[in-house]
């Protein structure tokens, strides 16, 4: 069921739609939010492409059940993966180098997604040596990032799940990181209204 993934994609689309018109104290703060939205959308479409292949590509947010396009058709898997690559590149371009978050997107997290993506493209989608080179470039960028280092004490890897070796993590433990929960990326069903559950809007034309 890809409902949660598309709910998250819709949230990212709305962020990308409205954030550019909001006044921020700094351009970096705005770009960080936009980069996170691109990263999350890439993350979701990457899963969708690998699990379902052909799938709808939605880039405009839905705000009403009266909008056009509520029953999108599936696009070829190749187009889905192309969208993933574009979103990853946009996220990397916008993400300020100073960001070192481990429970949100950062250049390190985006590069690891990029590496995973290009390895998949090389091995499964037969994208050729260029994809392998792109994966290697992304990995090297993370290895050369001073925000990450090996823990001196092996136990610290498990004691602090947002420690020096961690590039990206979801925080589950209470007070480990205030407000941290996986709903930032996948919306749990308990947060969906009863009306939506009882009368869901179909996502794909194949349903």
Per-region residue spans from a language model:
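Short linear capping/connector segments at secondary-structure termini
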Residues: 60-68
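Short strand->helix junction
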Residues: 23, 66, 98, 124-125
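Short, hydrophobic secondary-structure boundary micro-motifs
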Residues: 25, 57-61, 150-153
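Short coil/turn linking the two alpha-helices of tandem helical-hairpin repeats
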Residues: 49-56, 99-100, 120-129
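Conserved, well-structured interaction surfaces
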Residues: 1-52, 75-82, 88-102
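Second-shell loop/turn segments in exported
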Residues: 2, 67-75, 126-127
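An aromatic- and glycine-enriched ligand-binding surface/loop that stacks and positions planar moieties
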Residues: 1, 81, 88-92, 104-207
């Amino acid at each position: 069921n890809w409902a949660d993934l598309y709910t998250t994609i819709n949230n990212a689309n709305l962020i990308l739609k409205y954030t550019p018109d909001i006044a921020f104290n700094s351009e970096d703060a705005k770009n960080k939010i936009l980069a996170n939205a691109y990263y999350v959308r890439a993350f979701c479409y990457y899963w969708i492409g690998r699990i379902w292949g052909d799938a709808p590509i939605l880039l405009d947010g839905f705000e009403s059940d009266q909008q056009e396009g509520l029953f999108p058709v599936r696009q070829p898997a190749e187009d889905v993966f192309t969208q993933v690559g574009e979103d990853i590149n946009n996220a990397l371009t916008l993400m300020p180098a100073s960001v070192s978050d481990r429970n949100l997107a950062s250049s390190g997290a985006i590069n690891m997604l990029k590496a995973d993506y290009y390895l998949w493209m090389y091995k499964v989608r037969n994208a050729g040596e260029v994809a392998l080179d792109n994966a290697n470039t992304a990995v090297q960028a993370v290895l050369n990032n001073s925000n990450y280092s090996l823990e001196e004490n092996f136990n610290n890897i498990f004691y602090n799940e947002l420690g020096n070796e961690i590039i990206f993590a979801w925080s589950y433990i209470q007070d480990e990181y205030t407000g941290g929960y996986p709903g930032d990326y996948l919306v749990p069903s308990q947060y969906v209204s009863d009306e939506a559950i009882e009368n869901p809007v179909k996502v794909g034309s194949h349903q």
